[in-house]
Amino acid sequence: MSYKILSIILVIGTILAYITPETMPITAQTTSTVSNAANSYPISQNEWVEQQLQLLSPDERLGQLFMVAAYSNKDETHTNEISRLIQQYKIGGLIFFQGTANRQASLTNYYQSSSRVPLLITIDGEWGLNMRLSNTPAFPHQLTLGAIQDNGLIREMGSEIAAECKRLGIHVNFAPVVDINLNPNNPVIGDRSFGEDKYNVAQKAIAYMEGMENNGIMACAKHFPGHGDTDKDSHKTLPSVSHNIDQLHSIDLYPFQQLIARGVSGVMVAHLSVPAVDNTSLPNSNQTIPTTLSPKAIQQLLQQELGFSGLVYTDALNMKGVAGFYEPGVVDVKALLAGNDVLLFSENVPRAIEEIKKAIQRNEISQENIDQRVRKILKAKYRAGLHQYKPIDLNNIDTDLNNRNALLINQRLAENAITLVRDDNHQIPFGNLEQKRFASLSVDAPTLTDFQYALDRYAFFAHHTLKNSDPQANFDRKFNILKSYSHVIVSIHRTNKSASKDYGIDQKTQDLIRNLQSVTNVTVVIFGTPYSLQLFDKTPTLVMGYEDTHDFQSFAAQMLFGGISARGRLPVTASPYAVAGQGLLTTTPTRFKYTIPEDVGIQLGDLEQGIDRIMQEGMRTQAMPGGVILVAKDGKVIFEKFYGYHTYTSGKAVKTSDIYDLASVTKITCTVPCLMKMYDTGTFNTSARLKDYLPELANTNKGNLVARDILIHEAGLEAWIPFFEATLPAAIRSDAYRSQPDSVHYIPVAHNMYMSKPYYDMIWQRIADSKLSASGEYKYSDLGYFYWKKIIENYAHKTLDKFAEEQFYRPLGLSTIGFNPYKRFSIGRIPPSENDYEWRQQNVQGYVHDMGAAMLGGIGGHAGLFANANDLAVMMQMMLNGGYYGGRAFLNESTVRNFTSQQKQGSRRGLGFDKPEPNPNFKPSTSTKAPLTTFGHTGFTGTCTWADPQNKLLYVMLSNRTYPRKSNYKFINNNIRNRVQDAIYEAIERSKWYVKN
């Protein structure tokens, strides 16, 4: 029976077996079963291969050897040409280049539907699909991966890349590059290599390969026999490798041997002149034959000596490394005769097929040999699942590719790559922050960088920028400014790979850094090639950030301050002072890490969906104009998001860096920690009476009040006293206020509103004269905190704000927390708390909302503190850590445990801290899912913070629900704070990390 008749029969049978409702749109495709009237059964590899082979004439089988370049960003002319090659010449596969994922998927379906035998779809995706396709995840380049010590992360990356390839119908990824980059001036390999150490290269290549192969994508080791020690680009010419055969076996071939031993599916052969492998001269040239065209390189060395039996791919045949010596078609024949199975990127498929047919006629190669090559290709197609071909689902491709797992893997790779090259003065991670004045300088970034914004989370920074193109005068001015700071962190961006051009780092920049090093402490962080480290051999603190992306910039900053540990090691040698394998390891993290929920096993969707719904409801019902939510777990900030606007009418959007009035959260983030500090030193006793600290109260009804009773709100104090009413009406009481300060009116209560000193003194008398209710009954009161303020100030011999700043805020690196923020920040960063028509007759913005605290000059023991979400979270994390943060003990662990614990049966309160309500008959103070060990507080302005030791969980909510009127109780009545906390616990429950009591 002729092959044509057999082909017709097989096609008809295949179509009949294949037609189902799901597959009707696709024609002339293969099936996974062989069917007859009696039964159907799964088809074996050999059966399927022979079936497909018989579908093709001998001439058509030649087409299977070709893999043609396809683009998804070109026009219809290109698409039609590819379709013509598929239909007319039965080409075996496509290698996709630039374009988009959605377009490539559509084209793949179209091309597959045009092909009698399914096409093998491939891509150059060394750092993922993003190497060719826009808007897809970009993983780090291999040189960056060479710095990572945990190869399991690279295996995970390979698995994710495999999943993304499968989603796009790709079967082969031409990765990993296993070249050993021994030449810093290599123009084509460079950061595509894992580095210069053969063991490191091999181990990482194996991890990457196994990640793909174990998940159904065929890997391809390249560029055989090793393109690492070259100084020319084979795209443009024929590079030479001068290694002798022993060196090749010892170095260049080592990674190939290791991958072959572990079953790598493919090897790509490079266009290299390697006399030690084949010294046959090229015609009219003093160079030897390219390895792509050398039987000695492929059949003898690769297949016989190294034992490789998988698919052998040429490197692209349009590259000048071979195309510069032979005509199109001729070069294809020579590549085939050399032993290659797949001819990649042929310049002229029709001519190449004709030339191969001539070679068969000349008996240079047999049809049997061709058929064996085609069988290898078909077996690869079977292995790729093409015997069960299904078209690509075109729905949700972008979402599926840009998934949370890819983001998490990318972050972990960046985190583990950051390399602390040198730290001669033992500064990293930075400590004793209160003793340092920090400045940052970004070089050649267009604006303030993600690196600089990340630094802001850890300390107060003065940020500066310079560009290489700036005149020398600008550099001189920056020097005069920066030399006054104790620590300057210089980040270098937008570098290049050219050693002759100092990697894009201008001489002015190098001189500025050198001059700064002579007068202050300088840390240099380079987001570029590690070879550029040679320019900074005398920099005592040097960090390699590798890639100029958000993740690398963020984690470099985190490493400097102990948010993450330094783990990376240099993959290459830049100088005698920066050698391969060099990298300091720092201690375990001591400060917040900033990451994504998936880093602690929580899905962002689970967390965000519930929180967003409640916050949107709150804004829609005008329970609040906007706010910020922060969630930290296991010492990691996993969620920080802003919502809404500063007011209902302003149009000024909230930012996570905005500074809110904390109201009564002041108690547990200022006053109570100060009392705890005194408790640690033995100068405060919770069993003592007020008169022991304030003798002037001895003859009042307050003198015998016990500290513990005041802190748990059972001392009988009145809830509050409207002190401000004594100054009203302001229009009549002209003695009370002035618009400008003077010797009497100098207490600021609002913008251009200064209260007279006698009213300040009146406050203390009113409290002393106030009545007491029965002791032992719970009544929430602010009045005791007026006394705590005075007691702390008497002890410290300084104001409450200064003592808290000295003991906590500055050492913790908190840049926004404090009183009276209008003195330190632009008013635009501070959402207003109320349009106060009752007293101050103005928008209260940057001044404390609480009337009593305002009459104390904005510094109250019960209210007055402002902060952004991050600073508040750090303060609470310190207490969640048992008083420890940033490598430093701020409070004794036993003291924290004592103050944050429930103090007596029947009362939920800790010492100053609020806690979950244990009585189910009472209104919950927190989410009912919060364990009883949780501690925190709420604030009248719409704030709260809760720390849960059992789940190592921290929750911060900031809002200005009192704007424009404090009488708006929708926020409280709708239980916004607790419901957001519920949503957080529900997300944790779904992650199976939740602990209840």
Regions found by a protein language model. Give the residues of each.
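Preference for extracellular/luminal or secreted protein segments
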Residues: 25-84, 294-295, 325-603
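Short active-site loop at a secondary-structure junction
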Residues: 610, 620-628, 649-712, 771-784, ...
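Bacterial N-terminal signal peptides
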Residues: 8-17
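Short, surface-exposed loop or secondary-structure junction motifs
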Residues: 702-932
